[in-house]
Amino acid sequence: MARVKRGVQANRRHKKILKRAKGYYGARSRVYRVAVQAVTKAGQYAYRDRRNKKRTFRRLWIARINAGARLNGLSYSRFINGLKKANIEIDRRVLADIAMHDAAAFTALTEKAKAALA
C-alpha cells in the first residue's frame, strides 16, 4: 500500500484556524498551536455571551421602561401589573422603544395602566 501524506489536509486545517484567529494579538494570530487555543476559547465566550445577550437586553429594556414609568408616577412593577389588568399585551422590547422615542404614547399607556389599577 502507498504511504498517505497528510500535508494538504494539515495545511487546510492550519489555514482555517489561522484565518479565524486573524486580528488576534501576537502569537495568537501567527502560531498554530496557540491560535487553536485562542479560537476555541473565543468560541466558548461567543456561546456563553449569545445567551447572556438576551438577559442583558431584557435588563436594559426594564431599566428604560422603569425610567419612563417613574416620569409618569408609577413604578415598573405597578406599570406592568396595570398593563396586564388592562389586557394590553406589548412586550418589553416594544415598550422600551416607545418609552425612548414616543413619550406621548407611553404616557397614554401609563394612564391606561393607572386606570386598570384603580
Swiss-Prot record:
Keywords: Ribonucleoprotein, Ribosomal protein, RNA-binding, rRNA-binding. SUPFAM superfamilies: Ribosomal protein L20. Pfam families: Ribosomal_L20 (PF00453). It comes from the Bacteria. GO terms for biological process: ribosomal large subunit assembly; translation. InterPro entries: Ribosomal_bL20 (IPR005813), RIBOSOMAL_L20_CS (IPR049946), Ribosomal_protein_bL20_C (IPR035566). GO terms for cellular component: ribonucleoprotein complex; ribosome. GO terms for molecular function: rRNA binding; structural constituent of ribosome. The keyword Ribonucleoprotein applies. Binds directly to 23S ribosomal RNA and is necessary for the in vitro assembly process of the 50S ribosomal subunit. It is not involved in the protein synthesizing functions of that subunit. HAMAP family: Ribosomal_bL20. Belongs to the bacterial ribosomal protein bL20 family. This is Large ribosomal subunit protein bL20. The lineage of its organism: Bacteria, Pseudomonadati, Pseudomonadota, Gammaproteobacteria, Moraxellales. The gene is rplT.
